[in-house]
Design a protein with these regions (language model features):
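Basic polycationic patches enriched in arginine
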Residues: 2-3
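Alpha/beta catalytic cores of nucleotide-metabolism and tRNA/nucleoside-modifying enzymes
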Residues: 15-92, 97, 237-238, 262-278, ...
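Alpha/beta enzyme core
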Residues: 75-76, 95-123, 133-276, 280, ...
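Glycan-recognition patch characteristic of GH18 chitinases/ENGases
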Residues: 124-128
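Short beta->alpha linker loops
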Residues: 130-134, 316-319
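Terminal helix/beta-alpha structural elements that buttress the NAD(P)+-binding lobe
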Residues: 283
């Protein structure tokens, strides 16, 4: 049986990848780290935040060509991408049957013979992400697996319903069994610089989540500038967000490397100042295995290997898993299989 090597770092150094089989402990950040308790809104800090757009874009443009992992090393990184994936279905035609099939894929994301040959038996995705109405079927389908259900909430994707309804939706999803809540912020607060309103809204949503951990979706494609992205990231972390997330996947522009660089540097600055680790979730537009490799390399470079664990990193994705499975099969057999062999649901 073939065992995969560890995470490649700085071109030559290697660090061991461990896919944890204690699934619940591997995923829920409150079991590993003190939750981000938040801090009082510091408007002086928010006002000092800058984002050098040209420098960020130059750095991001160099990333795809700077790093290259091949063979066993690439397979190890791709298995890590699966372990930190929020396998997602957010379509208007979702049904309980589709969600059940997606959950079966979450339990067994790669063909058993492939995992056996890779020495990665026990590998699952990080979570399954669905609308509120699909939480109960997902919870039932994942029973005993340790894989948490994440629910999009708070008037997703626009987030423009009354606040009391958004908070009630969070409570309903938690009561139905969701252990992670992906909320959407009011973009107008960012665009008008109303940081107090954004902070208060985020704090109320965090409180409504209770023990479920909360991912704050910034909808970065609608925030106008990278400086707004950086400031919104900081305010949401101050208000207690466990994760910050790029996008709903419904915007015209979703996750990008410049946005990712901006957000993870905000995470690093917040950790340096407070000691709290906040997770990161890029979502939307990450459909190819090669894209996931670039994101993993960037996050490792900027935040370190601790942020490559499922409790601090997630990919919001649907089609990404199929491409990763095709790449792993090619690694083992030398041939690419047809896409229909790797259907999600």
């Amino acid at each position: 049986m073939r065992r995969l090597p560890g995470l490649w770092a700085q071109g030559v150094a290697m660090q061991k990848i461990v896919v944890q089989t204690d699934l619940t402990a591997a995923r829920l950040p409150q079991l590993h780290e003190p939750r981000n308790a938040g801090i009082a809104l510091d408007l002086d800090w928010v006002g000092r935040v800058q984002a050098n757009t040209s420098a960020i874009e130059r750095r991001a443009a160099t990333l795809p060509g700077r790093r290259s992992v091949k063979k066993d090393w690439q397979a190890a990184w791709l298995c890590r991408a699966i372990a930190v994936m929020d396998l997602t279905t957010l379509s208007g035609d979702d049904t309980a049957g589709r969600v059940q099939r997606l959950c079966a894929k979450a339990r067994q994301p790669v063909a058993p013979w492939m995992l056996e040959r890779l020495g990665m038996t026990g590998l699952t995705v990080g979570a399954v992400c669905v609308y509120h109405d699909m939480v109960a079927p997902a919870v039932a389908a994942l029973a005993g697996s340790g894989i948490p259900v994440a629910a999009v909430s708070t008037g997703f994707p626009a987030g423009l319903s009354p606040l009391h309804l958004r908070l009630a939706e969070i409570g309903a999803s938690v009561a139905a069994g969701a252990r992670e809540i992906d909320i959407v912020i009011s973009r107008r607060h960012v665009l008008t610089g109303n940081w107090q309103a954004l902070y208060d809204e985020m704090a109320a949503m965090r409180a409504a989540c209770g023990d479920a951990h909360v991912k704050a979706i910034l909808a970065t494609g609608e925030l106008g500038t990278l400086r707004n992205v950086a400031r919104a990231s900081l305010v949401c972390m101050m208000a207690g967000a466990d994760f910050i997330k790029t996008s709903t996947g419904k915007e015209a522009v979703n996750a990008t490397l410049p946005v990712t660089l901006t957000m993870i540097r905000a995470i690093r600055d917040y950790h340096d100042a407070t000691g709290f680790r906040v997770g990161y979730k890029p979502a939307g537009g990450i459909a190819k295995a090669k894209d996931a490799l670039v994101y993993l390399a960037l996050i490792k470079d900027e935040l370190g290997t601790r942020w490559l664990q499922p409790d601090l990193l997630r990919f919001g994705a649907s089609s990404l898993l199929g491409d990763i499975e095709r790449q792993l099969e090619h690694h083992l057999t030398g041939a690419y299989s047809a896409g229909y062999r790797h259907a999600m649901a």
